[in-house]
Amino acid sequence: MQPVLSAEQREIMRCACRSERELAIMDLLYSSGGRVSEICQLNIADMDFINRRARIYGKGRKEREIYFSAQASLHIRDYLKTRTDDNPALLVGVKTPCRRLTIAGIQWILKNIQNRDERLRGLKISPHTFRRSCGTDMLNRGAPVEMVKEKLGHAKADTTLQCYAKISTEAVRDAERRFGAA
């Protein structure tokens, strides 16, 4: 089973962020559950901050919506206020001319954030770790598999269960208390 980040590890990473852009990237990756390729393709015009959703093009160029948290919305809007360029991309590099961030660029940013706190050293953290953490956390909180499947843009619920259902010991214990035969 691939690793997921605990709430504490995500908070440690958030505290290690040094810019609104870094916070926006982390919060958007986790709260939306979007693929890093989908996040990189986002334009500012795709964002609906009132309803906290964005239009993306997923695998197979299928259009769908992703939803993001109020926290992500706040950090994205604060990040956009710091920008002085006219690039339509949501996430851009800091060097002029500001170009759309790539998958490798986001990986590099996350690795730098991770390296700022020794408690995160040795963990395998990638953009996909945030997606996996989002799906796993939703399942652990009792979200129906079908809902998680839709959020993550999976074609089949089997994919969701196989890749994201790392159920915590506490969740198993709670389920046994609530639904067990005892």
Regions found by a protein language model. Name each.
Residues 1-182:
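Conserved catalytic core of the tyrosine transesterase superfamily
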